[in-house]
């Protein structure tokens, strides 16, 4: 696979290019100006206007945390915010960003960097599973949709929000994964023999590989990182709209996710619901991890962490 090199280190970007991104920041933040108290944990839950993300965000707020709500649907986000405000134990603020756009993903990170001085937990939960398994969709950046939304967006956020995670250390990153299929680095975007479910599982494997790859580097910064298969085919809109029959509850997935947020579970692990699980062999392959990190940097112009360091 030939990848166009588009590395632009954030410290060397032209002023005009950086200014263009900064000027878009205001479009991502909602109107609320709610700030966390010093006693509250600050937790970003991507994809938190529905499904697992929504249930997790509400549970965290009930525990007294300040939750950064992310999604695309403003109306659904306001409903989540309203529930949190009516409960009164936690607080929240909403940011809108479409992860099918690297510009919007980076704009979200820039907005959060501008509005917060710390981040205790980053939960990379947002995901997509297309109902049409034969229609290959490409983002505005030219990348296969599942790979960008499910994996690259979380990679970008993890890299760009490292200063806030370090400011809150010990802090945590949790990648919400699923079943896995090995990546084909010669056809990373599935241009040949496309299958939507295959694309979904490969993107989830990339999340787990990222978890293992970043573990050593992030540990030096007192940041833990773990991946989770929350539960199989939960009763979420994404699963139902993709045409699958739900086989488990979103509450089970929520509780499994909360375990990684709240409990001392270590770092660099893949959890199958509540227990440590076994990922596919490629996920533990150091050379494959390093290759994924190199490719991710090339595709996004963001360096998140050194693989295996």
Positions of PLM-derived features:
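N-terminal Rossmann-fold NAD(P) dinucleotide-binding loop
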Residues: 53-54
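Conserved glycine-rich cofactor-binding loop
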Residues: 49-50
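Conserved hydrophobic beta-strands of the Rossmann-like cofactor-binding core
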Residues: 42-45, 122-123, 173
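C-terminal helical subdomain
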Residues: 244-282, 286-290, 294, 298
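Catalytic loop of short-chain dehydrogenase/reductase
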Residues: 127-147, 166-221, 229-242
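Conserved glycine-rich Rossmann-like NAD(P)H-binding loop of the short-chain dehydrogenase/reductase
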Residues: 63-79
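Rossmann-fold cofactor-recognition segment
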Residues: 87-103
